[in-house]
């Protein structure tokens, strides 16, 4: 766990609002030192959804966030030590992406793909490229500095994509230094119930 985390904000569409509020109640019992807040963006369809980045902006606005933030997709299961990710951010003081070296370029087509220099700075970043330039895949986990948060509104105001969260750092690295933390371990995108149950069995959790 990252001891510096004192608030957890979860944003959802209206359909799953009650489910997440129930989860937050249980989570608060396990982590009483952390304040949990669920935000219902009020949307009910693909036509009205805000998109991942639109939802992040929704929380920034409504929660009046003014702090460094860790943003991650709730459907990603990772086995690495999150503390190391945060320590890297503290050490360098730059916006930080979570990355992993994949085995093949074909696998990378499902992710944002980064080119890094020897110090881990992002030199190129593209969301789900048809022709990946490296095997460094960027996962949906980011630590952004407090002074980076207002830039998301600028990004959206320019008419850029509000959907996949990887689009924002692809815009951001061209304007300020962005680094990547390359982790060792596994991250699984839980896109189906079968994948969820598989992960539960492998890591001795109770499947549903």
Each language-model region and where it sits:
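Conserved N-terminal catalytic core of the sugar/cofactor nucleotidyltransferase
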Residues: 1-72, 77, 82
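Conserved beta-strand termini and adjacent loop/short-helix elements that scaffold enzyme active sites
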Residues: 11, 39-41, 99, 128, ...
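Short, surface-exposed charged micro-motifs
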Residues: 35, 113-115, 179
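A short acidic, often aromatic-flanked loop/helix-cap motif at beta-alpha or helix-coil junctions
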Residues: 42-48, 105-106, 131, 187-189
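Short, surface-exposed amphipathic charged segments that create phosphate/polyanion-binding patches used
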Residues: 48-57, 111-115, 140, 194-198
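Catalytic-core segments of class I nucleotidyltransferases/pyrophosphorylases
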Residues: 77, 86-90, 121-208
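Conserved donor-nucleotide/metal-binding helix-loop-beta segment in metal-dependent transferases, i.e.
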Residues: 80-109
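Short acidic-glycine loop/turn motifs at beta-strand connectors
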Residues: 115-121
């Amino acid at each position: 766990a990252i001891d510096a985390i004192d608030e957890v904000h979860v944003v959802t569409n209206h359909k799953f609002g009650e489910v997440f509020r129930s989860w937050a109640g249980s989570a608060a019992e396990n982590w009483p030192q952390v304040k949990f807040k669920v935000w219902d963006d009020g949307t009910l369809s693909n036509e009205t959804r805000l998109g991942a980045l639109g939802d992040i902006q929704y929380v920034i606005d409504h929660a009046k966030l003014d702090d460094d933030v860790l943003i991650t997709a709730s459907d990603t299961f990772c086995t690495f030590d999150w503390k190391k990710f945060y320590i890297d951010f503290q050490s360098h003081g730059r916006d930080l992406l979570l990355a992993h070296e994949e085995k093949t370029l074909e696998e990378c087509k499902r992710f944002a793909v980064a080119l890094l220099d020897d110090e881990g700075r992002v030199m190129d970043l593209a969301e789900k490229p048809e022709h990946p330039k490296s095997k460094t895949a960027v996962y949906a986990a980011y630590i952004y500095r407090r002074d980076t948060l207002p830039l998301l509104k600028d990004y959206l105001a320019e008419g850029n994509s509000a959907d996949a969260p990887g689009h924002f750092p692809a815009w951001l690295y061209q304007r300020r230094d962005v680094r990547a933390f390359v982790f060792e371990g596994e991250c699984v995108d839980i896109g189906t119930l079968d994948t969820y149950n598989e992960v539960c069995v492998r890591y001795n959790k109770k499947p549903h």
